[in-house]
Every structure is written in structure tokens, then in C-alpha cells.
UniProtKB/Swiss-Prot annotation:
Stored Pfam families: AIM5
Family: Belongs to the MICOS complex subunit Mic12 family.
Subunit structure: Component of the mitochondrial contact site and cristae organizing system (MICOS) complex.
UniProt-recorded name of the protein: MICOS complex subunit MIC12
Originating organism: Zygosaccharomyces rouxii (strain ATCC 2623 / CBS 732 / NBRC 1130 / NCYC 568 / NRRL Y-229)
Amino acid sequence: MSKLIKLTSITAVSSTLAASYYFYFVDRDGFHYQNSQWKKIGDKVQGIIDGSENINPSTPSNSNQVIVVKRPMTETMKDLWNEQIRNTANWFYSWGK
């Protein structure tokens, strides 16, 4: 009985793989494969390696600059402490309402 179950499961998996291969690569002249992102990237990389594809260098845009201000850690801790004190006071006074 167990050999029959193993044979059936192997046959089912093989049939599923064969059907998916057929529909992905063969059916409609490989439409899904030809339009897949993976193939497009592979073709572009192969073109760069062969030298037939031009590499356009990207220039960083200056319009998206982010200004970072570094504050001392003591100021950050003071802000956190003050926020906790305010939250505690609000919680305490909310009991009387």
C-alpha cells in the first residue's frame, strides 16, 4: 500500500511540474517567461556583459537632500523624561474628571 501511495504522489508532483513548465515556457510562445521581470533583468545584465547595452550613469538629485540635526543625548533624555512626567500628570488628573 505504501509503494502505491509513494508512486501516486511522485506522479502527481511530476505531472504538476510538467504542466506548470508547459504553461510558463511553451504555451503562447512563452508569453509569461518572455515578459517576466527576471528575464528582463537577465537580458539587461547579459547585454552589459557583452557590451551591447549602454550604461547610463545616474546623477544624484540635490532636491531630495535631508538635513540631519544631531542633538546631544542629554537633550533627548530630557525630552523623554518631560513627556513621561506630562503623561503621568495627565493620567493622575484624569481621575477627578
